Regions:
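Small-residue-centered hinge/linker elements
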Residues: 1-246, 250, 276-396, 400-427
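PDZ peptide-recognition modules
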Residues: 245-246, 252-256, 265
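Amphipathic alpha-helical
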Residues: 268-270
Length: 427
């Protein structure tokens, strides 16, 4: 009897695995076929580049195709890297086929606030080309509006929504649940490390004073930056921008218009009429010539000047000699492997060593986006960073966060560069 249970369970697992694998292959095949003709699409004159956030935007290349699958919708969507996005916007500024940019933040892709800050800065630089930048949405979240506020004009659907209510950070606690099942958790945290709050949910039922303090500082810092940038772009007073959130003054489209957050309430067809007046042509079907960010990136093959050594290190041609770009993204863990969302200490140390020993490589940039993790793995990486810095110039570029072990592995560098929205420091 047990034999047949095991047999049918294994058979069912094989069937499911086959179906999922087939779906992935078909989806990737369709995606590949969809890229045919993109060069012709890009060559269409008088087009508008649409930043629609249909795909996730990561700080580094992803290792697995599984990360490109939306399990809920069973769709395949190739994620973009921040470098690709920034390069695309920079290229569009001098591309004679691109008349301007339209920010359409209605997609389901995700992007961190720190990456949004860099994309926003790229759009502000794009505006120096004298090409137009407009934003249109059925509704704005705080993060999407942060990007949209960089546009020359911001439009909202007449019945659209507008979320502007400040920042809040929360923590889920598990101790009550663990107690019900009579489960004890052994916590190893030095008493002086009271700001190391990652373990608090397992032995506390509410937020500690130390954690509340640091989260308040973090939230206030991020919100201050957002309001400061929005106020500067929209020519508003920062105090007013913050007060509107505190008073919950804006939720409807009319509110956003009244307080100067949007310029006009228009329908989508009116947006296309605006494109006409800005020199964007229409195709044979009467649709405005637009190209999505992912299509533009694929058509231009922005990664063509990169020689991929492995999934975590790329050698960029900067005339001659070479500059190595190493990605360190995720939790720092022990071991030797490549898995999205994790930095394996042995693997990253080997890549740093490779860049150090490679005679062609004259300088190294390490992109760090990590909250930390294993002390052992961090120390293994730190040692290789020290040896690298002794032989070649090293620059750290911090992404969304570089805290604890993430900062530890960054410390030996000659220069450390962070964004205003980067969460960094040794706790």
């Amino acid at each position: 009897m047990n034999f047949w249970k095991i047999f049918f369970a294994s058979f069912a697992a094989i069937i499911v695995a086959t179906i999922v694998s087939t779906f992935l292959l078909i989806s990737m095949g369709v995606a590949s076929l969809a890229t045919f003709g993109l060069s012709e699409m890009h060559n269409t004159k008088n087009s508008v580049l649409c930043i629609d956030f249909a795909e996730d935007i990561f700080g580094s290349p992803q290792h697995s195709a599984v990360s490109s699958v939306d399990i809920m919708n069973m769709n395949y969507s190739q994620p973009l890297t921040l470098r690709q996005v920034l390069t695309a916007i920079e290229s569009a500024a001098t591309d004679p086929n691109i008349k301007g940019i339209c920010i359409r933040p209605d997609g389901l892709g995700s992007v961190s606030m720190a990456n949004l800050e860099e994309i926003r800065a790229a759009i502000l630089k794009f505006k120096q080309s004298s090409k137009f930048v407009v934003a249109y949405a059925d509704g704005y979240t705080q993060s999407s509006y942060y990007l949209a506020s960089a546009a020359d004009e911001v439009f909202l659907q007449p019945e659209g929504s507008f979320d502007w209510r400040g920042m809040a950070l929360s923590t889920m606690f598990y101790k009550g649940l663990l107690d019900k099942f009579d489960i004890d958790v052994e916590i190893f945290r030095p008493t002086v490390c009271r700001y190391k709050s990652a373990v608090e949910p397992f032995f506390l039922t509410k937020m500690s004073d130390a954690n509340r303090k640091q989260l308040e500082v973090l939230a206030n810092s991020v919100w201050n930056t957002v309001c400061e940038d929005v106020a500067a772009s929209r020519e508003l007073k920062k105090e007013d921008v913050m007060r509107y959130a505190a008073d919950l003054s804006i939720s409807l489209s009319e509110d956003a218009l009244r307080y100067g957050f949007v310029d006009r309430l228009i329908y989508e067809d009116e947006l296309y009429n605006l494109f006409d007046s800005l020199g964007v042509e229409r195709d044979s079907r009467g649709h405005s010539n637009d190209i999505s960010l992912s299509e533009y990136i694929t058509a231009n093959s922005f990664a063509a000047t990169t020689v991929t050594v492995n999934d975590n290190i790329a050698l960029e041609f900067v005339d001659k000699p070479l500059m190595a770009v190493i990605y360190a993204e995720g939790d720092i863990v022990d071991g030797d492997d490549y898995v999205d969302g994790n930095i394996f200490g042995t693997s990253l140390a080997r890549e740093i060593r490779q860049a150090r020993l490679d005679e062609r490589t004259k300088a190294v940039v390490v992109r760090v986006n990590s909250p930390g993790g294993s002390a052992l793995a961090s120390d293994v990486v730190w040692r290789e960073m020290v040896l690298l810095q002794q032989t070649k110039p090293v620059v750290i570029s911090m992404g969304e966060n570089a805290a604890s072990g993430g900062y530890y592995i960054s410390a030996p560098a000659d220069y450390i560069i962070a964004n205003k929205l980067t969460m960094t420091g040794s706790i």
